[in-house]
């Protein structure tokens, strides 16, 4: 099993080191600040980064569905907003799709232009599911009657559901984008159209639900057992939290796996836990396995509250900074430019 750590989600954008001369030329203070930030980031490895307890779980936050909103002609209200219950589904999953119509906010209105006529309901809402080859998968009828997945009758949120069929599933280990075109029409034939979508994902490996933890070289390692159907490259990511539910660290690992059962490690760098001042037991609050052989990646589900560790003491973990050479070198070069 080949293993290579990859950059964490939270810090990925920070690892594109800006041109040294550009930063230094802006202001000496900015260059000095950037150098200080690089030295702070260098305390931790790229595969394990601290997470502020005040922030949302980064894995769960990354899976939040995006709301797409489209007004009528010339910006006429009401605007149609559409979204899904998740950003990815697999064969057999029930996908829920939502739509609502609301007047535009003051910030979205051009006060210098004549106000277009606002259309009135009631509205009939339908959705067309189309795959990335343009093939229609289904036509859906949305409802606002409190039935079949609609949470509350008459609340203005229309709901449709669809069970992902095996007949249209992607090959195992791959995924494809599915678009949904949502149309709302009233009795006057006023129409609102908005586009949403999701990922139809068929991962090549699955988390089994088995985990084990150990202390290794001053860091906490949680191993996850996975069952692999097809050989390929896989990304495992997880968030470690305190017993009180505060996020502490995000860890990622990239591995090439052959078919069969394997244990894959997530290493949470010990200095993060030492500096947090929090002892165990810790919780693997979220974890997900992604098949990364082709684009788009085949996302697996995010499993929450996956594992509780032994009651490690925070003083058992290393107090030594990781000292990332690339970031320390960048900081040194910035500091040299500031002194010129």
Residue locations for each model-derived region?
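Aromatic sugar-binding surface patches on proteins
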Residues: 146-167, 258-273
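Short beta-strand elements
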Residues: 186-215, 293-340
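Conserved, compact domain cores that house catalytic/ligand-binding motifs in diverse enzymes
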Residues: 213-265
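Contiguous beta-strand segments within globular domains
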Residues: 74-124, 157-159, 214-223, 233
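Extended low-complexity, serine/threonine- and proline-enriched intrinsically disordered segments
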Residues: 103-141, 234-249, 286-291
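Short glycine/proline/serine/threonine-rich loop/turn segments at secondary-structure transition edges
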Residues: 151-153, 166-179, 272-284
């Amino acid at each position: 099993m080949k293993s290579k750590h990859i950059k964490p989600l939270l810090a990925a954008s920070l690892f594109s080191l800006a041109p040294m001369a550009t930063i230094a030329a802006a202001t000496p203070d900015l260059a000095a600040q950037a150098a200080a930030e690089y030295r702070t980031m260098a305390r931790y490895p790229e595969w394990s980064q601290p997470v502020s307890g005040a922030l949302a779980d980064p894995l769960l936050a990354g899976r939040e569905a995006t709301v797409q909103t489209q007004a009528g002609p010339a910006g006429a209200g009401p605007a149609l907003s559409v979204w899904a219950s998740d950003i990815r589904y697999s064969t057999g999953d029930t996908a829920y799709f939502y739509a609502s119509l609301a007047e535009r906010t003051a910030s979205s209105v051009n006060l210098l232009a004549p106000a277009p006529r606002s259309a009135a309901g009631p509205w009939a809402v339908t959705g067309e599911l189309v795959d990335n080859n343009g093939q229609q998968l289904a036509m859906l009828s949305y409802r606002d009657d409190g039935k079949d997945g609609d949470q509350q009758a008459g609340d203005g949120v229309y709901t449709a559901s669809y069970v992902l069929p095996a007949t249209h599933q992607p090959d195992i280990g791959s995924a494809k984008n599915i678009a949904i075109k949502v149309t709302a029409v009233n009795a006057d034939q006023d129409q609102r159209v908005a586009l949403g979508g999701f990922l139809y994902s068929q991962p090549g490996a699955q988390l089994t639900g088995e985990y084990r933890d150990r202390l290794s070289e001053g860091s906490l390692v949680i191993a996850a057992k996975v069952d692999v159907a097809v050989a390929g490259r896989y990304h495992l990511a997880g968030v470690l939290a305190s017993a009180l539910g505060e996020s502490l660290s995000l860890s990622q690992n990239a591995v090439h796996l052959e078919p069969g059962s394997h244990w894959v490690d997530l290493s949470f760098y010990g200095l993060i836990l030492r500096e947090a001042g929090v002892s165990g037991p810790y919780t693997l609050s979220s974890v997900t396995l992604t098949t990364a052989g082709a684009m788009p990646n085949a996302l697996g589900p995010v499993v929450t509250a996956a594992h509780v560790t032994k009651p490690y003491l925070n003083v058992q973990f290393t107090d030594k900074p990781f000292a990332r050479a690339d970031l320390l070198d960048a900081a040194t070069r910035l500091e040299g430019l500031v002194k010129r």
